[in-house]
Amino acid sequence: MVDALTYDDVYVNFTQEEWALLNPSQKSLYKDVMLETYRNLNAVGYNWEDSNIEEHCESSRRHGRHERNHTGEKPYEGIQYGEAFVHHSSLQMRKIIHTGEKRYKCNQCDKAYSRHSILQIHKRTHSGEKPYECNQCGKAFTQHSHLKIHMVTHTGEKPYKCDQCGKAFAFHSTLQVHKRTHTGEKPYECNQCSKAFAHHCHLRVHKRIHTGEKPYKCDQCGKAFVGQNDLKRHERVHTGEKPYKCNECGKAFVCNASLRTHKTTHTGVKPYECKQCTKSFASHGQLQKHERIHTGEKPYKCDQCGKAFASHDKFQKHERIHIGEKPYKCKQCTKSFASHDKLQKHERIHTGEKPYECKQCTKSFASHNKLQKHERIHTGEKPYKCDQCNKAFVYESYLQVHKKTHTGEKPYKCNECGKAFARHSHLKVHKITHTGEKPYKCNQCGKALAYHSTLQVHQRTHTGEKPYECEQCGKAFANQSYFQVHKRIHTGEKPYKCDQCGKAFVGSSDLKRHERVHTGRETLQM
């Protein structure tokens, strides 16, 4: 698949040394070629994002070019490509694009490029050179085009508007890419796994998953990344910079995508709809993640244990289990976390902030995930289905835990007493029996609890709140686990089976009580 032709594809850059070696006629020829290239691309509606282009061409021989405009003369015919070029050197450049020739090689990483100018830009990833500086905030960039894009964050100018959803963009090319989110067009396909992308740069970054290449390295901690944007986001962990601010509530974010998602909590707009279940999402990224529920696709695989993930975020979090990295530190209690979103959730324990509100019952939550879980109580949606017994679940994590009832797998083992558990959360609860730690205190009765979620359930004993209501008999519960057990009275489901006599039970606590009949241990009074 051949990419759309851009000015960079046909622009040939000379260093000062190379330019000095050219004779006057060669220099003149070069200027003419660049001017003609400018005109040709302009004629087909190319969107100019670099105002310096005309500076390359302003000394051209305009009179000679003007004459050819009248005569239509095109002395060099590219027969193989069915195109005519005004100069031989322009034809040569075009041939390089078609043949894929890459004669300019980096002496540090052996990566090769078709043009010297691109090699020079690439070398800056090794040297750290950022020659293009913003005169408003001092931020520096490796490429002039990146500086121009950054400048828009100061001016806010977005003249290009999508006629389908009204979203505005700073550049025409960005609008064209955005339109593909509506049409579903993905012209850039990976030749290794056939995954397709709407944007060529996304394909380039994706290919590094296959090659293992991570060319962008953090100067402070040495961590390497697949894409430049990933590095930029990571660097903000060290600097604490949050450049994207919500103009409604003043909340700031590390990346623009997080700000866009946050803004939907104010507007409620969800323009991205799933074609399989008609569920809508605030961002295209959220839609893509959701679609993997239907397809089962898990493109992110751990090299160490082989575990695969549907989202890159979950993959990154998992990687930190192996290396033990927790780069996100709470400034109030110095507790560290493997991911930024976990730190944010934790910080809300200190601030009490609950920015995510349910529109049906006005209940508020500290995280968007908790709001989503809660909303399924109202909708009854259970998108995750067990392929062995067809039981459906609200979340994939619940499905994974349920599957262990079929396999008997208990991968989470206590390193103090050897007891094993099906869920990591159950192991965490168990560990408290050894440590006795209870950091969460009820402000009404002073009772201390091991977990924030347990504190929330406990507080319902004071408020009388019972958010989990049975649709069949109307009985309500303060605790979701009690609600789940109660529903089995109606369905007749008894998932907990005694290994010794085969008797089945509605809840795990019922099974435990029964097992004491066999062991001879006294049953606890209820």
UniProtKB/Swiss-Prot annotation:
Gene that encodes it: Znf431
Any single Gene Ontology cellular-component annotation: nucleus
Gene source species: Mus musculus
Protein's name in the database: Zinc finger protein 431
InterPro entries, sorted: KRAB, KRAB_dom_sf, Znf_C2H2-type, Znf_C2H2_sf, Znf_C2H2_type
Protein keywords: Differentiation, Metal-binding, Nucleus, Repeat, Repressor, Transcription, Transcription regulation, Zinc, Zinc-finger
ZnF segments: C2H2-type: 104-126, 132-154, 160-182, 188-210, 216-238, 244-266, 272-294, 300-322, 328-350, 356-378, 384-406, 412-434, 440-462, 468-490, 496-518
Purpose: Sequence-specific DNA binding transcriptional repressor. Represses target gene transcription by recruiting HDAC1 and HDAC2 histone deacetylases. Acts as a specific transcriptional repressor for PTCH1 during embryonic development. Required for osteoblast differentiation and sonic hedgehog/SHH signaling response. Binds to the consensus site 5'-GCGCCC-3' in the promoter of PTCH1.
Domain writeup: The KRAB domain is necessary for its repressive activity.
CDD domains referenced in this protein's UniProt entry, alphabetically: KRAB_A-box
Subunit organization: Interacts (via KRAB domain) with HDAC2; the interaction is direct. Interacts (via KRAB domain) with HDAC1.
Chief location category: nucleus
Transmembrane stretches, start-end: none
Tissue specificity of this protein: Expressed in brain, heart, lung, thymus, spleen, lymph node, liver, kidney, muscle, testis, ovary, skin and uterus.
Biological process according to GO: cell differentiation; negative regulation of DNA-binding transcription factor activity; negative regulation of osteoblast differentiation; negative regulation of transcription by RNA polymerase II
Ranges of residues in domain KRAB: 5-76
One example GO MF annotation: histone deacetylase binding
UniProt subcellular location: Nucleus
